[in-house]
Amino acid sequence: MKANEIRDLTTAEIEQKVKSLKEELFNLRFQLATGQLENTARIREVRKSIARMKTVIRQRELSVNN
């Protein structure tokens, strides 16, 4: 998901997506440890998506405080 798409969502929706992505990341890491993961690049994609979403949330927090 691109940053522009994330900015269109509400903060609550973003937080919900972060939660689901963290669960997916946990499962991907578990699959990696057990040797079942085929697409290892997916871990990187999920981590970057979480970071993008957290960045948008933080930008909103800072813009409200200023």
Curated annotation (Swiss-Prot):
The keyword Cell membrane does not apply. GO terms for biological process: translation. One of its GO terms (molecular function) is structural constituent of ribosome. Signal peptide: none annotated. The keyword Ribosomal protein applies. SUPFAM superfamilies: Ribosomal protein L29 (L29p) (SSF46561). GO terms for cellular component: cytosolic large ribosomal subunit. Keywords: Ribonucleoprotein, Ribosomal protein. Belongs to the universal ribosomal protein uL29 family. NCBIfam families: L29 (TIGR00012). PANTHER family: 60S RIBOSOMAL PROTEIN L35/50S RIBOSOMAL PROTEIN L29, LARGE RIBOSOMAL SUBUNIT PROTEIN UL29C. This is Large ribosomal subunit protein uL29. It comes from Oceanobacillus iheyensis (strain DSM 14371 / CIP 107618 / JCM 11309 / KCTC 3954 / HTE831). The gene is rpmC.
